[in-house]
Amino acid sequence: MTEKFPDLPDLQPETLRVSGLSLSRGDITLVRDFSLDLAPGQAMLMSGPNGTGKTTLLRAVAGFVRPDAGRVVFGEGPKADSASELVAWLGHADGLKPVETPRQSLRFWAKMNDQGRDPILPLMRAMAIESLIDRPASRLSRGQQRRCALVRVALANRPIWLLDEPAGPLDGGGRARLAALVDWHRSRGGSVIAATHQSLDWPDAKRIDLGAHR
């Protein structure tokens, strides 16, 4: 699959280093002594049964959850320890209001990230949803909503993507589009961590089972 992706401002690629991270919920240990180094252009797929802490670990890397122990460092020098300008986050919610169209929603997110509107349609075309640009989100399928959310992530133009079950509601075609989007991001020096229950075909991606870190 060959897609035409838009020209966005150059990324400022950054490394990500996680050292000795431990996380718990109440008295239950979810993750123990987890470490990783992720360089620009790399991707990592985290797997594991429900309850192994995939979402909690992603949220800790994003700075939403304080770990029990360990450290998360982005880049080097003065930007170290700060995720605010480096991370694009995709959680379980797609961030679409039912009465809004993708055009309205994505224009809002583009403005929030100081991006122009021009990349919206090419990114929607790359995800094969350009014909839905003026359809209210309430009339989109879950898979179509997820594709819109992935466009939102790309519009942020951040070097590090943290994706929680990005392919959850996607069909085979959607997963292929997701793989192409991730490949484009990595080709620009971006990196990706994704938590997933599904087998995703991302070339050269690191794979880790969180069940080994409990």
UniProtKB/Swiss-Prot annotation:
ABC transporter domain boundaries: 16-212
Assigned GO CC terms: plasma membrane
Membrane topology note: Peripheral membrane protein
Broad EC category: translocase
Subcellular location: Cell inner membrane
Catalytic activity, EC: 7.6.2.5
Catalyzed reaction equations: heme b(in) + ATP + H2O = heme b(out) + ADP + phosphate + H(+)
InterPro entries given in the database record: AAA+_ATPase, ABC_transporter-like_ATP-bd, ABC_transptr_haem_export_CcmA, P-loop_NTPase
Name the record gives this protein: Cytochrome c biogenesis ATP-binding export protein CcmA
Lineage: Bacteria, Pseudomonadati, Pseudomonadota, Alphaproteobacteria, Maricaulales
Gene from which this protein is expressed: ccmA
